[in-house]
């Protein structure tokens, strides 16, 4: 299958904002895809090369990419760099360079999707001494044979700056439409495996029956079940039917642990493989987990010198560290508090009631200094739960989780079977969709950021406010550097940005607002942290903001 067909799909997707049209375009394309291509083409459509849980990274920045194009076209790197000032997009500038190419090999072959994919895999798997030169040559070989439109989208794929507006929900709907299968079965299969390539292939070859049989697989992370927030303990108990399991809510990073014999793999909430960054937890898991094969979930917490928990950002620092890991183990010791088990020795437990899963967890875990089981309380009594809540806060934790005793595990769902109880309103994780250049000495920096929440109905990120406080000068330098390559268009001092970067914000309150299409505005938002553990698909939705607005009003006693 020719790569130009995929490039033309990207171009069509870019030209429309209509979700239904995009879905139909992707579905029609998927119908034509050979069976042996379905394992990787869904990721290319998303603008990726690998699933998010795959450790492989391309490791190619703008400079290396420009050098590869220069090698392929004979056009000086500086000329390509200068062109970006006019086009505002490196992909467009690379397309222009290929159009002006000074030579094309006599043996040039039209690019196939398979060749492009296999080359990108080779680029990702090339490491060590001399790897940058090898990566450059692999890419140059693609650009030598590429048409301008192909070069544009190869470049965007390499840099992770595709602008087609295709996200997980749209791809799910397109798979359902292409292969005439139930969308809820596609959703379920994806939530269980986090692998669109696998799901698309099953949908095409085995239809609804095959999708219905999809189950958990060790080595493919499950989308985590999520919780809403309750106003207080009393509300949580009422929602749970009068009795609930209360667990300490740790201020850490949620992880999913897959054990397969001596092999242990640990995934972050965003399903990224963080195993190498936390070797002491890997060893502790091998000792603590009795079954040969198991999938468990827990909260990874950083512990301070006083034995109290440190903010979750410390855990993220551990995740990011690729070198001198032993030094970081000393500086930021970690502790894993397990709270659920989803799979044991060939048996999926997601359709098992929560209390049975909790008992199973206690049976299969032998706690040690690094691996513990989350402290809990099962009660019908509000006062007893209040005392537990008070103790959790005194210990430096975030609050409590309340869980329905008969709840099955619902991957990817944020329902009311799990509820958080915290002393303050929940912070929001929102996507930066635009920004404004600063004033005076900050004129060269982006100084305030337009925040967007995801609307699953349209696939858009809708504005809910603008944040300019809480940032240090260093933060603004870093955000400007990070966001500049993602700028889509400029309107005076305002720029619009590809929705890729998620930040956590606090706010005084949520207000209803006719000013924004979202219907809501944040009052006095303030930057808290960059959420590197979350992608745009993990950001808070308009529906979630509506739920928090109702919760806020209940807390005020207005509802």
Swiss-Prot record:
EC class (word): ligase
Gene Ontology molecular function terms on file: ATP binding; DNA binding; DNA ligase (ATP) activity; metal ion binding
EC number: 6.5.1.1
Highest taxon of source: Archaea
Active site residues per record: 249 (n6-amp-lysine intermediate)
InterPro entries documented for this protein: ATP-dep_DNA_ligase (IPR050191), DNA_ligae_ATP-dep_bac/arc (IPR022865), DNA_ligase_ATP-dep (IPR000977), DNA_ligase_ATP-dep_C (IPR012309), DNA_ligase_ATP-dep_cent (IPR012310), DNA_ligase_ATP-dep_CS (IPR016059), DNA_ligase_ATP-dep_N (IPR012308), DNA_ligase_N_sf (IPR036599)
Homology family: Belongs to the ATP-dependent DNA ligase family.
Function noted in UniProt: DNA ligase that seals nicks in double-stranded DNA during DNA replication, DNA recombination and DNA repair.
Name recorded for this polypeptide: DNA ligase
Record organism: Pyrococcus abyssi (strain GE5 / Orsay)
